[in-house]
Swiss-Prot record:
NCBIfam families reported in the protein's UniProt record: tig (TIGR00115)
The UniProt record lists the keyword Secreted: no
Gene symbol of the encoding locus: tig
Protein name from the UniProt record: Trigger factor
Signal sequence extent: none
Catalyzed reactions per annotation: [protein]-peptidylproline (omega=180) = [protein]-peptidylproline (omega=0)
Keyword entries, A-Z: Cell cycle, Cell division, Chaperone, Cytoplasm, Isomerase, Rotamase
Family designation: Belongs to the FKBP-type PPIase family. Tig subfamily.
Protein's cellular compartments: Cytoplasm
Gene Ontology molecular function terms on file: peptidyl-prolyl cis-trans isomerase activity; protein folding chaperone; ribosome binding
E.C. numbers: 5.2.1.8
Length: 428
């Protein structure tokens, strides 16, 4: 195997990789062994026909695709290792030459890790945050706890109000025709949850049990179902039941029930303390973000589009995994929000770019400041990770490969870089 590297600019390179004719023939043989049992050749039992007979019958290129799938990954990885390129995105593969008895040639266009030229990263100026917890914020937090301890009661003597849980039957029509997925029975809808599109929920406020309501809405222009996007719709809705949350009184008895305190004032003081700690933590994070933004602004780097695309895909996969843990699929999320996959991915772009820029400048600070992580610090981090995963440290170490360990160490070094630039920043 041989290769050459061509710099395409903007941190993109093109590898032209050539596998020998002998290696390509070995890959064809692998493909033959994989597929021969699936091929019918007159005069031979399945799996017994010689390769030459199959190639004559089906064409000399019958095994080329599978052979390429065998040879490309191995040759690509070898070229990356030997070239010592720091690849940061999936390669774009293009087969240049595939011919029996000849070398197999393909190209791989890849994004490589950008070089960062740091500007000022110590003593950057950021706005100072003032930490204050108001009485209104304390009462809002208290109301959250009251709502968590509320009970649901059936309401029969009034119309629908905001925050009610309304049981409805509904059917949707576009241009007078019912559409797929637009019908539901005994659906429990919380008014104000924005679970349904447009002003659907608002139009139920003031309606009574047993009332038939015509709700007029317009689907979002970016709605996931293209045949409905941007179209007006009529929903025929029947209000079947109204339920409301009944909150407990905010008094000493309530404070004693939900906390270790005997009086409401003591409990409110504890809520204030918790809110202050939360605001302190948020202010620390906001300061770190602001400082990193300044460091990015002062630095010079060129991010290839392929690197951003890879980050977007990773973020989408992470988001889908979080949804799955909540019992939802990405498709259901699109349905609820009216987004489509293309818009969703586009929306991830700025955040993906910011993550990449942040990581690159912080790794550059790690290098510039010669930041290191001790063995003791690594062991402590692994112990905390093992505890979080509820496994033995030795078992975790077995599961973590060398690359994963290097990533953990770099993550720790990056956090030290954040602490450094934040501590050196000037609050004005």
């Amino acid at each position: 195997m041989s290769f050459k590297v061509e710099d395409l600019g903007k941190n993109m390179v093109k590898l032209t990789i050539e596998a020998t004719a002998e290696d390509f023939d070995k890959a064809i043989e692998q493909a033959y062994q994989k597929n021969k049992g699936k091929m019918n050749v007159q005069g031979f039992r399945k799996g017994k026909a010689p390769r030459a007979i199959i190639e004559k019958m089906y064409g000399v290129g019958v095994f080329y695709e599978d052979a390429a799938n065998f040879i490309i990954p191995e040759a690509y990885e070898q070229a990356i290792e030997e070239s010592k390129l720091d690849v940061v995105a999936r390669p774009e593969i293009d087969v240049v030459q595939v011919e029996k008895g000849q070398p197999f040639i393909f190209t791989a266009e890849v994004a490589v890790k950008p070089e960062v030229t740091l500007g000022a990263y110590k003593g950057v100026e950021v706005s100072k945050s003032e930490i204050e917890v108001t009485e209104d914020e304390i009462m809002a937090e208290l109301d959250k706890v009251r709502e968590q301890n509320s009970r649901t009661i059936t309401v029969e003597d009034r119309a629908v109000m905001d925050k009610d849980i309304v049981t409805i039957d509904f059917e949707g029509f576009v241009d007078g025709v019912a559409f797929e997925g637009g019908k539901g029975e005994d659906y429990a809808l919380t008014i104000g949850s924005h679970s349904f599109i447009d002003t659907f929920e608002d139009q139920l406020v003031g309606k009574n049990i047993g009332e038939d309501v015509e709700v007029n809405v317009t689907f979002p222009t970016e709605y996931h179902a293209a045949d409905l996007a941007g179209k007006p719709a009529l929903f025929k809705v029947k209000v079947k039941e109204i339920k409301a949350k009944e909150l407990p009184a905010a008094d000493d008895e309530f404070a004693g029930d939900v906390s270790e305190f005997n009086t409401l004032e003591e409990y409110k003081a504890d809520l204030k303390k918790s809110l202050t700690e939360k605001k302190d933590k948020a202010a620390k994070t906001a300061k770190e973000d602001a400082v990193v933004d300044k460091v990015i602004e002062n630095a010079t780097m060129e991010i290839p589009d392929a690197m951003v695309d890879t980050q977007k895909r990773q973020m989408a996969e992470d988001f889908a995994q979080r949804l799955k843990m909540q019992g939802l699929s990405l498709e259901q999320y699109f349905q609820f929000t009216g987004l489509n996959p293309n818009t969703f991915m586009e929306n991830l772009g700025p955040q993906a770019l910011k993550r990449i820029q942040s990581r690159l400048v912080l790794e550059a600070v790690v290098k510039a400041e010669n930041i290191t992580v001790s063995v003791e610090e690594i062991d402590k981090e692994l112990a905390e990770m093992a505890s979080a995963y509820q496994m033995e440290v030795d078992k975790l170490k077995e599961l973590i490969g060398e690359k994963e360990k290097e990533q953990i160490v770099m993550d720790m070094a990056v956090q030290k870089a954040i602490d450094l630039v934040a501590s050196e920043a000037k609050e004005v």
